[in-house]
């Protein structure tokens, strides 16, 4: 016989062999357990016989010739008395047709044995009452049918075939033994859990002590901070001194530009009306480079001329000569520390050069000068003015400008310079949507301000809106055609859009505005305070156009008119 492929003659599939096995089995144990049992009618059911050989037929005749048939009913009664009746505990799904006709578990590759009639009948009354522990295979099937896996079910072993009646009492005794082992195992697990809880409690106690110690240390440090803070309270005069020290600190974090460098060949040097000439040149729309020479002559004649230094700084920043403009504006503030126009212009120049902290400190000085009550309330509300990181300083100054803007929120009384300062603060933190709102508000208040239109164009360009930026720059040049910085910004926008020919045209025009006429009528370019940004950007445009032959031709002192004629640009 083979457990892997049982045939018709195998004991697992032969009903007569199973009958004979039951009749010859020792039933002394069952007899001792059923002294009070009565014989009842046996309701054995046998299915149609299969073909038998001679040996099987002889076994059958021997069995049939016995005086009385083997009675299984008393044994079944005794089993019902020994084992708990699980019939009432069976779920309705288990009492259905599938429960009445259970199918033994079949392992793949192994033939499923045929089930005899008596075995089927016995399984109707006994096998459904025996608890088993499910295998992983049976658990998967239960879940797939929507049934929760039963606990303590032990699956059949397909190699042993259907459960035999003679093995039931042995299984009862084995189950009692297994229950005893289970109880011992459970007691052991409970003891282990108690030991783990004790160990955990022992570990938590030092941790709680550590937390308590840390809280005490924190309280002590906090008390020390409060005492130190109370001892270091500053008066208003001390606040003012600290504020000035703060400004000087941030102003010194940038590059030291030193003294302003004057142009050697200046046609206005000996003109006593150089300052007035410079004003007229700006009003008439002359080149900014010519006006710069006039203001240079004015401050050389009178180094204490505040307005001349201010005008010189404004002209040089608009002429795309940022460093020269910063030097002039700082000199102006040395002479007049509370000059509002110089403070705002210098703060914007600091932002352009990347000195953000110096710009924030300059804007803070601007608020303190124009809106002292706002600064005073801020000092009283927030005595800690020691924060020197970029973000904290920007936040502090931004709050000051917002409070100043709330004093005149709208209408003719709105301070456009407050909106400009707010826009610069937001611009430095790359918050371009807020920047646009501020500069647009400033333009609404003064629609003909070329500087405001140029700032709006820069914000639009950094917001990835080059078309709108070009419109803003174009409006700037309509208001001030000699605004070199606006032409430079316009050229950069054209490069970003791939319109290199237009970019080159505006950049060359900006360079041509640096040329001035000398006393003999010839054109020349200032040798001092030259702009490198225009030259470097023009080289980028030629590189993008694949005109490498022109890159080396672009250098300081370039004669733009001759360059255009020679290279047809």
Curated annotation (Swiss-Prot):
Residues 23-42 are annotated as: Disordered. The keyword Lipoprotein does not apply. One of its GO terms (molecular function) is peroxisome matrix targeting signal-1 binding. One of its GO terms (biological process) is protein import into peroxisome matrix, docking. Monoubiquitinated at Cys-9 by PEX2 during PEX5 passage through the retrotranslocation channel: monoubiquitination acts as a signal for PEX5 extraction and is required for proper export from peroxisomes and recycling. When PEX5 recycling is compromised, polyubiquitinated at Lys-21 by PEX10 during its passage through the retrotranslocation channel, leading to its degradation. InterPro entries: PEX5/PEX5L, TPR-like_helical_dom_sf, TPR_rpt. Residues 57-72 are annotated as: Amphipathic helix 2 (AH2). A motif (WxxxF/Y motif 2) lies at residues 183-187. Residues 218-234 are annotated as: Amphipathic helix 4 (AH4). Gene3D superfamilies: Tetratricopeptide repeat domain (1.25.40.10). Keywords: Cytoplasm, Isopeptide bond, Peroxisome, Protein transport, Repeat, Thioester bond, TPR repeat, Translocation, Transport, Ubl conjugation. One of its GO terms (cellular component) is peroxisomal matrix. There is a cross-link at residue 9 (Glycyl cysteine thioester (Cys-Gly) (interchain with G-Cter in ubiquitin)). TPR repeats lie at residues 272-305, 306-339, 340-377, 378-415, 416-449, 450-483, 484-517. It is found in: Cytoplasm, Cytosol; Peroxisome matrix. A motif (WxxxF/Y motif 1) lies at residues 118-122. Signal peptide: none annotated. Its main location: cytoplasm. A motif (WxxxF/Y motif 3) lies at residues 243-247. Interacts (via WxxxF/Y and LVxEF motifs) with PEX14; promoting translocation through the PEX13-PEX14 docking complex. The TPR repeats mediate interaction with proteins containing a C-terminal PTS1-type tripeptide peroxisomal targeting signal (SKL-type). Belongs to the peroxisomal targeting signal receptor family. Receptor that mediates peroxisomal import of proteins containing a C-terminal PTS1-type tripeptide peroxisomal targeting signal (SKL-type). Binds to cargo proteins containing a PTS1 peroxisomal targeting signal in the cytosol, and translocates them into the peroxisome matrix by passing through the PEX13-PEX14 docking complex along with cargo proteins. PEX5 receptor is then retrotranslocated into the cytosol, leading to release of bound cargo in the peroxisome matrix, and reset for a subsequent peroxisome import cycle. This is Peroxisomal targeting signal receptor. The gene is PEX5.
């Amino acid at each position: 016989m083979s457990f892997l492929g049982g045939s018709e003659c195998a004991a697992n599939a032969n009903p007569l062999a199973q009958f004979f096995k039951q009749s010859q089995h020792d039933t002394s144990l069952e007899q001792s357990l059923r002294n009070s049992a009565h014989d009842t009618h046996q309701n054995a059911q046998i299915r149609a016989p299969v073909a038998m050989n001679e040996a099987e037929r002889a076994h059958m005749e021997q069995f049939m010739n016995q005086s009385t048939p083997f009675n299984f009913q008393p044994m079944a009664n005794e089993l019902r008395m020994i084992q708990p009746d699980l019939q009432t505990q069976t779920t309705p799904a288990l009492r259905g047709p599938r429960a009445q006709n259970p199918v033994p578990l079949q392992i793949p590759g192994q033939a499923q044995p045929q089930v005899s009639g008596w075995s089927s009948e016995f399984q109707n009354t006994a096998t459904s009452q025996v608890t088993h522990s499910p295998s992983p295979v049976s658990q998967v099937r239960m879940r797939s049918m929507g049934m929760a896996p039963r606990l303590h079910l032990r699956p059949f072993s397909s190699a042993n075939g259907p459960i035999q009646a003679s093995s039931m009492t042995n299984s009862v005794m084995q189950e009692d033994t297994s229950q005893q082992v289970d109880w011992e195992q459970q007691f052991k697990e409970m003891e282990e859990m108690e030991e783990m809880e004790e160990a955990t409690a022992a570990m938590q106690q030092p941790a709680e002590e550590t937390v308590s110690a840390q809280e005490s240390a924190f309280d002590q440090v906090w008390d020390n901070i409060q005492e130190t803070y109370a001892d270091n309270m500053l008066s208003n005069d001390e606040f003012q001194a600290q504020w000035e020290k703060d400004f000087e600190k941030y102003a010194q974090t940038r590059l030291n530009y030193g003294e302003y460098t004057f142009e050697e060949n200046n046609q206005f040097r000996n003109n006593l009306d150089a300052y007035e000439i410079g004003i007229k040149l700006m009003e008439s729309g002359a080149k900014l480079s010519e006006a710069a020479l006039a203001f240079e002559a004015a401050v050389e004649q009178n180094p204490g001329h505040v307005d001349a230094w201010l005008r010189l700084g404004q002209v040089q920043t608009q002429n795309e000569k940022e460093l020269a403009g910063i030097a002039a504006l700082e000199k102006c503030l040395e002479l007049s520390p509370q000059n509002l126009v110089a403070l705002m212009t210098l703060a914007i120049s600091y932002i352009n050069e990347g000195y953000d902290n110096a710009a924030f400190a300059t804007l803070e000085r601007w608020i303190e000068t124009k809106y002292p009550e706002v600064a005073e309330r801020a000092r009283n509300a927030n005595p800690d003015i020691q924060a020197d990181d970029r973000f904290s300083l920007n936040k502090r100054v931004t709050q000051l400008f917002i409070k100043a803007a709330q004093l005149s929120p709208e209408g003719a009384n709105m301070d456009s310079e407050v909106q400009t300062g707010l826009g610069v603060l937001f611009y430095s933190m790359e918050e371009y949507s807020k920047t646009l709102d501020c500069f647009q508000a400033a333009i609404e208040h003064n629609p003909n301000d070329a500087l405001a239109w140029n700032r709006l164009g820069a914000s639009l360009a950094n917001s990835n809106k080059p078309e709108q930026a070009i419109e803003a720059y174009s409006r700037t040049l309509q208001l001030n055609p000699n605004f070199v910085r606006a032409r430079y910004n316009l050229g950069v926008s054209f490069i970003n859009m791939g319109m290199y020919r237009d970019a080159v045209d505006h950049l060359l025009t900006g360079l041509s505005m640096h040329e001035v006429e000398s006393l003999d009528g010839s054109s020349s370019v200032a040798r001092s305070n030259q702009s490198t940004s225009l030259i470097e950007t023009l080289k980028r445009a030629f590189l993008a156009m694949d005109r490498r032959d022109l890159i080396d031709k672009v250098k300081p002192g370039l004669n733009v008119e001759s360059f255009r004629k020679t290279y047809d640009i």
